[in-house]
Curated annotation (Swiss-Prot):
Annotated catalysed reactions: tRNA(Gly) + glycine + ATP = glycyl-tRNA(Gly) + AMP + diphosphate
Segments traversing the membrane: none
Gene: glyS
Name this protein carries in UniProt: Glycine--tRNA ligase beta subunit
Enzyme class: ligase
Family note: Belongs to the class-II aminoacyl-tRNA synthetase family.
Swiss-Prot/TrEMBL keywords: Aminoacyl-tRNA synthetase, ATP-binding, Cytoplasm, Ligase, Nucleotide-binding, Protein biosynthesis
InterPro entries: DALR_anticod-bd, Gly-tRNA-synth_bsu, Gly-tRNA-synth_heterodimer, tRNAsynth_Ia_anticodon-bd
PROSITE patterns the record matches: AA_TRNA_LIGASE_II_GLYAB
EC number(s) recorded for this UniProt protein: 6.1.1.14
Length: 672
């Protein structure tokens, strides 16, 4: 078995593309191996800051053989009246380098059918690797040189080998070779003797090509530091992944910043050091002034440590200055400054947005029937929920939006419940009631406002993150078990920006509700479709979905779905629910009517308690009465008044079922 290697060497890759490249390499390698009929025991992909590629192990000597078929002339054209080949057939065979032995007859035509022997793997791999490299997609490709080529970054070298043999491959005007390059400024060219020794060869040039091995190396160095220092480092997965993405030979750097900066709020210190210097802060019960960073290359000299310390101290000094200046300005005054900050040109300033958030929050409090004293707390929190955006610290460190609002509010002696909500309302899973109310109000205002001015997300583009905001609204409603009308809330929010609730906006929320049920709650596709019309009251839709999901697999409920389908199909084009029981001629009509009234009362009471499982149990009581009705009553009679009256009566049953879900989808599933 053989081993193949592809390495593409480029200028420094953006860390933001790291996971995308990794995923694409894995998926496209598998696709191309299948397309080129090459089996591989394992596929190892690697991505570094200056290279990416793939190692294919346990490759066969050749492609798999395949049977080639080609359609030829019709039989009446291919043979004469004596059954001998005509010139048409002979020409077809000659052009395809085939003989009569390869001919088969099917569906009135001549077909060539022959086994094509697979090519040697070294002849196949160049095309496979070329397709792999050129098949990757990037958000922001760039051109270089004469502008002829476009890629994520300029490509400087290509290594393509099978075992110890260099493959004949050319991409971007570069011919493949066995020469790679080590860490910039620390190692020059590196000759790869064969594919199996790729990783060990690169290590000599201070390059750990495998991202998995780099991550392991980072964690080992952190473990060693903790044992040596008796301090702890929080394993921040996001930061670790970023370090792995931007380095090829990560070596630990341990330094200290001035202890006076420990007087700053911990969030400021961590943000300044983590987000802006990609460093960890060591803990020893509490935050210490020791930081851990990672330098790319060999063991860093002392001047590198000093450089890190100088930069971090300067960053923290700036943060201290901004923080002290902010403490001189109350949140109320910061809020006034929002009048000078544009939220969106057509939607006014951030101050305007805050005013809308207050109104939507108040409406939500009314819908939830919250006491006036609590509503007042909500409105106080809403009035300052964006104030810290005008602060100097948030201007410098946008990641601290909301966090600084909480800190400043507590410093001013503002109620802790209100202060916490300022930060909490930004969360995708708010932990407080006030934060949840503000979170819904803020997101609804953003979504409605963007739809009002034409910023509508598509399947591929959502620059304002409206889909995620809608998902969070559903998540908050479910967590708090709030039985509210989202439709009414959207209508109210729309009026605040001079907009009318549109079909486009309704379709958007219905679509997000469907995805939320499937992706977050694990609801099956058919059940999600069955309750999708209930998105306007999300909690009811969610509870209905969970109840239907639970019972839809039980045999005793399959009859219920069939009964509903009979009613639904005959009434789907009928709108009226007004009927006169005096017009009923048959006993089965009267029996179903009486049972309907009995069941309806019980179902409505169950739904009032949000008990959808109980409601479904009551609905099943209708099944035998529905069967008797359809067995003995002909609905579509010629007499107009009887026909319309019967349809209108059945429409009542249909609408009662629809309050729980459109079970026709579940009927279809049960019949699969």
């Amino acid at each position: 078995m053989r081993t193949a290697l592809l390495e593409v060497g480029l200028e420094e890759l953006p860390a933001s593309e790291f996971h995308s490249i990794l995923k694409q390499l894995e998926e496209k390698s598998a696709e191309l191996l299948k397309a080129y009929r090459v089996s591989s025991g394992s596929v190892e992909v690697f991505v570094g800051s200056r290279r990416f590629g793939v190692i294919l192990k346990n490759l066969p000597e050749r492609q798999e053989d395949f049977t080639e078929e080609k359609k030829g002339p019709p039989l009446n054209v291919a043979y004469d009246e004596n059954g001998k080949p005509t010139r048409a057939l002979e020409g077809f065979l000659r052009n395809n380098n085939a003989s009569l032995e390869n001919v088969v007859h099917r569906e009135g035509y001549v077909y060539l059918s022959r086994v094509v022997e697979g090519k040697p793997v070294e002849e196949v791999l160049p095309d496979l690797f070329r397709d792999l490299v050129l098949g990757l997609n990037f958000r922001k490709p760039m051109r270089w040189g004469s502008g002829e080529h476009e890629y994520i970054r300029p490509v400087h070298w290509i290594v393509a080998m099978v075992d110890g043999r260099v493959l004949d491959l050319e991409i971007f005007g570069l011919r493949s070779s066995r020469i790679s390059y080590g860490k910039r400024y620390h190692a020059g060219s590196i000759e790869i003797p064969d594919s199996e020794r790729y990783y060990e060869s690169l290590k000599k040039g201070f390059v750990i090509s495998s991202h998995l091995e780099r991550k392991k190396f980072v964690l080992e160095q952190i473990d060693e530091f903790e044992k040596r220092s008796s301090m702890k480092i929080e394993r921040d997965e996001e930061l670790i992944e970023e370090i792995v993405a931007i380095t090829e030979y990560p070596r630990i750097v341990v330094g200290q910043f001035d202890r006076k900066y420990l007087e700053l709020p911990e969030e400021i210190i961590v943000t300044a050091v983590k987000h802006h210097q990609r460093s960890f802060i060591a803990h020893k019960g509490t935050l210490t002034n020791t930081f851990v960073a990672f330098q790319d290359g060999p063991q860093p000299p002392e001047n590198v440590v000093k450089g890190y310390e100088r930069v971090i101290n300067a960053r923290l000094e700036d943060a201290r200055y901004y923080f002290q200046k902010d403490l001189e300005t109350p949140l109320e005054k910061m809020n006034e400054k929002l009048k000078e900050i544009v939220f969106q040109e057509k939607l006014g300033t951030l101050y305007d947005k805050v005013e809308r958030i207050k109104k939507i929050s108040q409406r939500l409090c009314e819908d939830l029937k919250l006491p006036g004293s609590f509503t007042q707390k909500v409105l106080e929190a809403a009035s300052i929920c964006k104030a810290d955006i005008a602060s100097k610290v948030v201007y410098e460190f946008p990641e601290l939006q909301g966090v600084m609002g909480r800190i400043y509010a507590l410093r001013e002696g503002i109620n802790e419940e209100i202060a916490t909500a300022i930060e909490d309302h930004y969360s995708e899973e708010p932990q407080t009631v006030i934060g949840s109310i503000l979170g819904i109000a803020d997101r609804i205002d953003t979504i409605v406002g963007n739809f009002a001015i034409g910023n509508v997300p598509t399947s591929s583009k959502d620059p304002y993150g409206l889909k995620s905001k809608a998902d969070t609204i559903f998540r908050i409603i479910r967590k708090n078990e709030w039985d509210i009308s989202l439709e009414e809330l959207l209508t109210f929010a729309s009026s605040l920006v001079g907009y009318r609730l549109s079909e486009e906006l309704e379709t958007f929320f219905a679509g997000r509700f469907y995805q939320f049920l499937i992706n977050e709650l694990g609801i099956s596709f058919d059940v999600a479709r069955a309750v999708n019309h209930l998105w306007k009251k999300p909690l009811r839709g969610i509870l209905s979905a969970e109840a239907l999901q639970e019972i839809s697999e039980k045999p005793e409920f399959q009859d219920l779905f069939v009964g509903f389908e009979r009613v639904h199909n005959i009434t789907k084009n009928h709108d009226s629910t007004k009927f006169d029981g005096a017009l009923f001629e048959k006993e089965e009509e009267k029996k179903l009517m009486n049972k309907f009234y009995e069941v309806k009362e019980k179902v409505l009471k169950a739904l009032e308690r949000l008990n959808y499982r109980e409601a479904l149990q009551y609905l099943i009581e209708l099944k035998p009465y529905i069967d008797e009705y359809f067995d003995n009553v002909f609905v579509m009679v010629k007499r107009d008044d009887l026909r319309v009256n019967r349809l209108s009566f059945l429409k009542n049953i249909d609408e009662l079922f629809m309050m729980v879900g459109d079970m026709t989808y579940l009927v279809k599933r049960s019949q699969v």
